[in-house]
Amino acid sequence: MADPTLLILASLALGDKHGYAMMVDIQAFANVELGPGTLYGAITRLEQRGFIRPIAGGDRRRPYHLTAAGKRYLEEELARLESVVRVGLGRLRRA
């Protein structure tokens, strides 16, 4: 169960990337394969929310940049997930 939104934002937290580079990075750090439809659908939604923005470039690959709003959202969601993991692991240990 992997949220493509968080995976894309986490990938861009390390620096600007185009779609294919994001797919490779996400596969490497999360062991999750995002198909092009899933990736580019999520990219469109992230752009609409102002969390990422495309960078003008000369070649046909369009790199994306994590905005300040996207960074804030990623930080908040990762903190929330960290809390969920902590609670979940604690409950498993008691079971």
Feature names for model-found ranges:
Residues 1-38, 58:
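N-terminal helix-turn-helix DNA-binding core of bacterial DNA-binding proteins
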Residues 11-14, 55, 73, 77-80:
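Histidine kinase transmitter module recognition
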Residues 22, 70, 81:
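Conserved anionic group-binding/transfer micro-motifs
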Residues 39-41, 45-46:
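Basic amphipathic alpha-helical segments that dock to polyanions
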Residues 47-58, 65:
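Beta-hairpin "wing" of winged helix-turn-helix
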Residues 59-78:
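Basic, amphipathic "hinge/linker" alpha-helix immediately C-terminal to the N-terminal HTH DNA-binding motif
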Residues 75-95:
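Amphipathic alpha-helical dimerization/coiled-coil segments
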